[in-house]
Amino acid sequence: MDPLGPAKTQWSWRCCLTALLFQLLVAVCFFSYLRVSRDDPTVYPNGSPFPDSTGTPAHSIPLILLWTWPFNKPIALPRCSEMVPGTADCNITADRKVYPQADAVIVHHREVMYNPSAQLPRSPRRQGQRWIWFNLESPSHCWHLKAMDGYFNLTMSYRSDSDIFTPYGWLEPWSGQPAHPPLNLSAKTELVAWAVSNWRPNSARVRYYQSLQAHLKVDVYGRSHKPLPQGTMMETLSRYKFYLAFENSVHPDYITEKLWRNALEAWAVPVVLGPSRSNYERFLPPDAFIHVDDFQSPKDLAQYLQELDKDHARYLSYFRWRETLQPRSCSWALDFCKACWKLQEESRYQTRSIAAWFT
């Protein structure tokens, strides 16, 4: 009989027990890592953190965090029920301290596109928290779209196929008689204006303008042209019969404040360069604007504008739609409320590929 037998047996059991405890510890650490990774979009950037989640708000009144102000410009945030009576409310804040409790996070693309890995939220993501990708720029001016894939559950943009449609403007019927006075033609003392902040000589809109101004006088306002002091834009542009609502790039539904504010609020007929005429007609009557594509050349457009300048009846026909419709411009506060209402209407939790969609 081996005198060391009992000791060997005891030692073997201790080794086995130690090995089992070690394996158990490794398993606990591994599954803990998986749990944290599942909560953290920086670990699984290409998949839904919680694919089985319903996205149901954790609070009776949903809490929405504005991770970034659009263009770093804070605004007042009135209650949604004050903006549109009878609608639901949310608690909307830009205080990042509420991130762990937020039901939704709105991220405006421009403020995170330069370094997404550092500028997107990096803390673990609460289960069911929905991220909303908010964007006001065209794809031509959006960087690192691929880096957004796998993070966001809802899209919010000027594109009509967004989950949350936030156009730059729209038309809506008058609730009663039109509240505006008839157009005062005698106040229209100038012909064509264009206000442009980003002057790129090789851009399509600048090249078209240069060809047009060879046949027609165009007053250009902006950094490199005539000054347009703050607060005087509408007063200045309202003196013109036509306004060049030329977009900086051509993409579906990309119809910006150049039309909705600069032209329509100034009661100038918009001359548009952007998406197709049929795209514009999804949002405007066909006789509410003039499209550059309707003419074979800038020279032909110049001739047409000069004809309208002399023919008051034809010129006034571009305002006939105002008898039944009125233009409205967007506000970011209303956009945030649209997100609030969408979150309460729909509990679906999905993961969108931003890069594949936003082209």
Curated annotation (Swiss-Prot):
Lumenal side: 35-359
Entry's Gene Ontology cellular component terms: extracellular region; Golgi apparatus; Golgi cisterna membrane
EC code(s) of this entry: 2.4.1.152
Catalytic activity: a beta-D-galactosyl-(1->4)-N-acetyl-beta-D-glucosaminyl derivative + GDP-beta-L-fucose = a beta-D-galactosyl-(1->4)-[alpha-L-fucosyl-(1->3)]-N-acetyl-beta-D-glucosaminyl derivative + GDP + H(+); an N-acetyl-alpha-neuraminyl-(2->3)-beta-D-galactosyl-(1->4)-N-acetyl-beta-D-glucosaminyl derivative + GDP-beta-L-fucose = an alpha-Neu5Ac-(2->3)-beta-D-Gal-(1->4)-[alpha-L-Fuc-(1->3)]-beta-D-GlcNAc derivative + GDP + H(+); an alpha-Neu5Ac-(2->3)-beta-D-Gal-(1->4)-beta-D-GlcNAc-(1->3)-beta-D-Gal-(1->4)-[alpha-L-Fuc-(1->3)]-beta-D-GlcNAc derivative + GDP-beta-L-fucose = an alpha-Neu5Ac-(2->3)-beta-D-Gal-(1->4)-[alpha-L-Fuc-(1->3)]-beta-D-GlcNAc-(1->3)-beta-D-Gal-(1->4)-[alpha-L-Fuc-(1->3)]-beta-D-GlcNAc derivative + GDP + H(+); a neolactoside nLc6Cer + GDP-beta-L-fucose = beta-D-Gal-(1->4)-[alpha-L-Fuc-(1->3)]-beta-D-GlcNAc-(1->3)-beta-D-Gal-(1->4)-beta-D-GlcNAc-(1->3)-beta-D-Gal-(1->4)-beta-D-Glc-(1<->1')-Cer + GDP + H(+)
The protein's role, per its UniProt record: Catalyzes the transfer of L-fucose, from a guanosine diphosphate-beta-L-fucose, to the N-acetyl glucosamine (GlcNAc) of a distal alpha2,3 sialylated lactosamine unit of a glycoprotein- or glycolipid-linked sialopolylactosamines chain or of a distal or internal lactosamine unit of a neutral glycoprotein- or glycolipid-linked polylactosamines chain through an alpha-1,3 glycosidic linkage and participates in surface expression of the sialyl Lewis X (sLe(x)), Lewis X (Le(x)) and non sialylated VIM2 determinants.
GO biological process, one term: protein O-linked glycosylation
Stretches assigned to the Cytoplasmic side: 1-14
InterPro entries, A to Z: Glyco_tran_10_C, Glyco_tran_10_N, Glyco_trans_10, GT10-like_C_sf
Entry GO MF terms: 4-galactosyl-N-acetylglucosaminide 3-alpha-L-fucosyltransferase activity
SUPFAM superfamilies: UDP-Glycosyltransferase/glycogen phosphorylase
Residue intervals passing through the bilayer: 15-34
Pathway field: Protein modification; protein glycosylation
Major location category of this protein: Golgi
Keyword RNA-binding: no
Name of this protein: 4-galactosyl-N-acetylglucosaminide 3-alpha-L-fucosyltransferase FUT6
Subunit note: Homodimer and monomer. Monomer (secreted form).
